[in-house]
Amino acid sequence: MSAHAGFLLDSSVALGAFFEDEQNDYCVSVWRSLVDVPGFVPALWHLEMGNILSRALRAGRIGTDALDDCWARMAAIGLQVLPFHGDARHWTQRASDWGLSAYDACYLDTALQQRLPLATKDKQLADAARRVGIPIYLNSAESRR
């Protein structure tokens, strides 16, 4: 399946590494696997994580020390950023075809282009991935919710 050894990491799984109320066994297993298995993210991932973390900071869900810790932990795992392909029209069409947001369509399209399994907790994204033949990384009951 894979053009690269490894998997594509969705932000929904990464959140489980930073927020206890988002955590489950699937998130922990995926995060731990990054010690031995390369993790890839689409170019939008860091911006998406920045948006999530800045909203958490503004809402008082995390403090600045926790924010710094999140960024340090992300840097330490050495995620490899995959470049964008396509344009806004491409992402809009993919989103429409798959019934996803343009962001999630970016994840799925990147997984297809790179032939990578996808690590996600997002049921809608996981269902769309399965429909187009993309396996869910470390497939488990929790990754199917």
Report the location of each language-model feature.
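Alpha-helix capping/helix-boundary segments
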Residues: 14, 45, 86-87, 107, ...
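Phosphate- and divalent-cation-binding pockets in alpha/beta enzyme and binding domains
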Residues: 26, 48, 90, 127-128
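Short, well-structured N-terminal submotif of metal-dependent ribonuclease cores
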Residues: 1-44, 56-68, 132, 143
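Acidic, PIN/NYN-like endoribonuclease modules and their adjacent C-terminal/linker elements
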Residues: 1-6, 108-145
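Short glycine/serine- and small hydrophobic-enriched flexible loop segments
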Residues: 51-58, 113
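Acidic catalytic patch
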Residues: 43-46, 66-98
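Short beta-strand scaffold positions
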Residues: 9, 41, 102, 119-120
